[in-house]
Amino acid sequence: MAMDIETLLDLEKLYSAIMTYFDNPLTLLIVVATIIIVLIVIVWITKMVIDLAPYAYVNARIRSKEAKLFDDAKLNELIESGSLEELVGLLEDTDYGQYVIEVMNELKDPVAVEKALDMYLADLYGLIYRISPDSAKKVLKVFAKKFDIKNIKTLIRAKFVGLSAEETYALLIPLGNIPVEKLKELAEVKTVEEVVRGLDGTEYFKILQEELSNYDQTSNIIGFELALDKYYLESLRKTIMTEGKEEDIFREFVGTIIDVENLKVILKGKADGLSAEELSKYVTLTGYELADWKLKDLMSAGGIEGVLSGLEGTSYAEVLAEAMEEYEKTKSIYAFEKALDKFVLEKGKKLSTRKPFGVGPIIGLIVSKELEVKNLKAIIKGKIENLKPEEIRSLLISL
């Protein structure tokens, strides 16, 4: 039916014309509903594309990094290497090559090697941060605080054992939020107390100052380290307490990390005979799966067996129960720490597939690389200490 412009402008005639085609009102209703549904789908797809587009480039870069992760064959090759020099040769064509080669003359020093690998991680974090969209940067920036924390711990340990300024600075990683000039200045001081005072004006000063009286009484620096770990986890938790789908993924990941680190503190505390009151100073409440009341129950539990019993019904019960046999043989908390680190790895991998075109791959790469570096440190340390291949394998977190 041909319609001229005047007819189109006449709403009544337009209605009549439409009804000529759709003499059944139900047919018209179906057509209108279909149009609305199509529009909703178009809007949803458009929004999804807009949300995911910023991750296209970063995820392409991350996939290329993931492709270079060590498989079991590569790890076995490193473990079976005949010497440190041979091991470094095997690493030469990997992402770690340039970092390890720089400390070839210090290969017998596990601290120098550890610093080289930490430098790799720091550079990786820097790369991911630079290429990530703003929705991910706020959490990645807090993750990068771990290098500040590591430097502060190193400064405190160095001054506790009386290292010189030169020896101290050689151990630091010149990355993070603390300026390099400030790190040099802190390396020059003589005592632990001076390190704390030198951090006045930074976000870390208050928590360290609160631990000074405990240090004065016990001459034990573990309180500083636990307080810093707690502060780091609380910073992560505060950052991800926002709305949004990307933050939901980060929230689950960070919450799991908080659960795991809390369990490490509690298990170590039980092994060392700490009271619930002492433990509560260093446990970060509100993780992902472990509620505040559950953490308080675990801190009050009787020994390690009591902690494991108190975890019944959680995702961590089976993980730690499987590690109990190794703990009973070795009497080392490392058996539990290794099992919990593996749990975090598996969680990261699951989350990376849940949001494969968004923030998921970022989480997957971070957790995979951190545990790969832990394994590398264990292999190199094992070679330095002349451990047998099977002994080195027992230290690794399976990937």
UniProtKB/Swiss-Prot annotation:
Optimum pH is 6.0 for ATP hydrolysis. It is a peripheral membrane protein. The keyword GTP-binding does not apply. Optimum temperature is 80 degrees Celsius. GO terms for biological process: proton motive force-driven plasma membrane ATP synthesis. InterPro entries: ATPase_csu/dsu_sf, ATPase_V0-cplx_csu, ATPase_V0-cplx_csu/dsu, V-ATPase_V0D/AC39_subunit, V-type_ATPase_csu/dsu, V-type_ATPase_csu/dsu_dom_3. Coiled coil: none annotated. It holds the Pfam family vATP-synt_AC39. It is found in: Cell membrane. GO terms for molecular function: ATP binding; proton-transporting ATP synthase activity, rotational mechanism; proton-transporting ATPase activity, rotational mechanism. Its main location: membrane. Keywords: ATP synthesis, Cell membrane, Hydrogen ion transport, Ion transport, Membrane, Transport. The keyword Transport applies. GO terms for cellular component: plasma membrane; proton-transporting V-type ATPase, V0 domain. The A-type ATPase is composed of subunits A(3), B(3), C, D, E(1 or 2), F, H(2), I and K(x). Purified ATP synthase is 25.9 nm long. The hydrophilic A1 domain is 9.4 X 11.5 nm, the central stalk is 8.0 X 3.9 nm and the membrane-bound A0 domain is 6.4 X 10.6 nm; the domains are connected by two stalks. ATP is synthesized or hydrolyzed by the A1 domain while ion translocation occurs via the A0 domain. Component of the A-type ATP synthase that produces ATP from ADP in the presence of a proton gradient across the membrane. Belongs to the V-ATPase V0D/AC39 subunit family. This is A-type ATP synthase subunit C. It comes from Methanocaldococcus jannaschii (strain ATCC 43067 / DSM 2661 / JAL-1 / JCM 10045 / NBRC 100440).
